[in-house]
Amino acid sequence: MRKRISAIIMTLFMVLVSCNSGGVAEDPKTVYLTSIANLGKGFLDVFVTFGDMVTGAFGIKADTKKSDIGKYFTDIESTMTSVKKKLQDEVAKNGNYPKVKTAVDEFVAILGKIEKGAKEASKGATGDVIIGNTVKNGDAVPGEATSVNSLVKGIKEIVGVVLKEGKADADATKDDSKKDIGKLFTATTDANRADNAAAQAAAASIGAVTGADILQAIVQSKENPVANSTDGIEKATDAAEIAVAPAKDNKKEIKDGAKKDAVIAAGIALRAMAKNGTFSIKNNEDAAVTTINSAAASAVNKILSTLIIAIRNTVDSGLKTINEALATVKQEDKSVEATNTAEATTSGQQAKN
């Protein structure tokens, strides 16, 4: 995409040079070519600006803080805001060609949804603790409902315009291996909390699915998830309800409705990102703490890296559409309003002289 836009800019530049080689005053055709070249350069600058956001997208680690995830979504929001403004400014400054303006307006609407979703999701990832925040010999703590809901709503908004791939019910590991994962969400005696085998089962579920699967499982979650105050994790039916499930004595199994790898991975990711969310591990199970914190980071990493790639692809596609519109613009396509404004400006300058 960047090469294609650069090629158009270079071609237009060469035409401009040939038009001005005689040193004559600018004619309408030259003004037109200049404005188109400026548009192309402006759109290339937008592409470069967006590319800056990709750096560090794959850097989520076990010691990454919840607030760092919130900042990541805030960065997506601010980048979309910047890209929207640059696109609109370039069209306004360089001719208001209706064909290009229509393509830009449609693209800006998509960017607006990404911006809105990122802003909402950023509200959910808060807290100056690491994303897994696993505790030994203590009860698991559910993700704050408001926090989880913001993450679900925001991610839904973004996924709705950037991602079609993924299976919300993706499932590859055996059911028997998943029966103990619910111990990560319990309140009970230490003997019944999760050990490293349970943590490894959770890691296996996360490893068995793609980032797109996890995102689609979040999309399929209910907004305003129900937290069952009696049966806790055993009444969870989707990823959001896994994330907010309260810890209850001896309630330690994820049931059939939610016992899918993609749903489990999404529930762990949401709980890991959300305010207050923790997992419960047996005392003296240091290996299990490392395992689940790393697994939670992996789930979050899959979500964010898949999102950024999907957003990048959407931006590439949008710029391609604008580029195609730019290539078809003719001198006479300039809007009447822009032409009149230019003529009025020229007349005013001549009057002053």
Swiss-Prot record:
Residues bearing a lipid moiety (S-diacylglycerol cysteine): C19
Membrane topology annotation: Lipid-anchor
Region forming the signal peptide: 1-18
InterPro entries reported in the protein's UniProt record: Borrelia_lipo (IPR000680)
Keywords per UniProt: Cell outer membrane, Lipoprotein, Membrane, Palmitate, Plasmid, Signal
PROSITE patterns linked: PROKAR_LIPOPROTEIN
Main location: membrane
A cellular component term, taken from the record's GO annotations: cell outer membrane
Coiled-coil intervals, chain numbering: none
Additional observations: Genes for both Vlp and Vsp families are on (usually) unnamed linear plasmids in B.hermsii HS1.
Function as written in the Swiss-Prot or TrEMBL entry: The Vlp and Vsp proteins are antigenically distinct proteins, only one vlp or vsp gene is transcriptionally active at any one time. Switching between these genes is a mechanism of host immune response evasion.
Protein name according to UniProt: Variable large protein 17
